[in-house]
Design a protein with these regions (language model features):
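Extended, histidine- and acidic-residue-enriched regions that form the cofactor-binding/catalytic faces
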Residues: 2-220
């Protein structure tokens, strides 16, 4: 007999910092003093995709991980470090590497003072200066873990050696699965598909879960 949907256990929700009261935040951190901080970008990834494609992807992964593990999830930093935009793609915007680095340092320093002992910084943008700005964030004692979602091996799913070699196609498939209403026809015509997007998303989520949230914490 199939379970009654009305009696099924409710699906866990992400622990969204901006929607929680101070008491709820304190209770969450007392149970698990970690914080997920997604870092996005506003840039052209494909002519048929929204400018915030990388942010949309990292938002979905952050929400899923927060819900699965009950870890506090900070509001997304929407801007990152991008290459200089081509003129035909207006509104691409970039922070300087130093600016992003300083902003993240200020954020984690403040949160560390409130008892957070591990930061999980997620991004879906593999531009080297962007990753350098994130990976050099420092703390006094808290652990900082930086995750480039596209560093996960996806070659067997995409047919290319590195995700960055077909970044537009990877984003297109992911968004066809996650937010199909935001994908224009020209992105679908590139060979991207929701089926591939689901496989990519599940691979990324599983690998991050295994390596960051399920792996034993190394002894100091």
């Amino acid at each position: 007999m199939s379970p009654d949907p009305q009696n099924a256990d409710p699906k866990p929700l992400p622990q969204l910092l901006k929607q929680m009261t101070p008491g709820e935040v304190a209770e969450t951190l007392a149970r698990d003093p970690r914080l997920i901080l997604p870092v996005g970008t506003i840039e052209k990834t494909h002519p048929g995709l929204p400018m915030g494609a990388s942010t949309i992807v990292v938002d979905h992964v952050a929400d899923a991980l927060s819900a699965e593990f009950g870890v506090l999830r900070a509001p997304t930093v929407e801007y990152g470090v991008n290459a200089v935009s081509e003129p035909e793609y207006p509104a691409s915007v970039t922070l300087r590497k130093k600016t992003l680095h300083r902003m993240l340092n200020d954020l984690v320093t403040t949160w560390e003072c409130h008892g957070i002992n591990e930061f999980v910084l997620l991004t879906a943008h593999g531009y080297d200066p962007h990753l350098e700005a994130i990976s050099t964030v420092g703390t006094v004692r808290a652990r900082v873990r930086v995750v480039d979602l596209f560093a996960v091996n996806l070659s067997d799913l995409t047919g290319v050696r590195r995700s960055e070699d077909d970044r537009g196609g990877v984003y297109a498939s992911l968004l066809l699965y996650l937010t199909p209403s935001l994908v224009h026809a020209e992105a679908s015509d590139s060979g991207a598909s929701a089926e591939q997007g689901r496989a990519l998303y599940e691979r990324i989520r599983a690998r991050v879960s295994e390596r960051i949230f399920l792996a034993p914490v190394p002894s100091e």
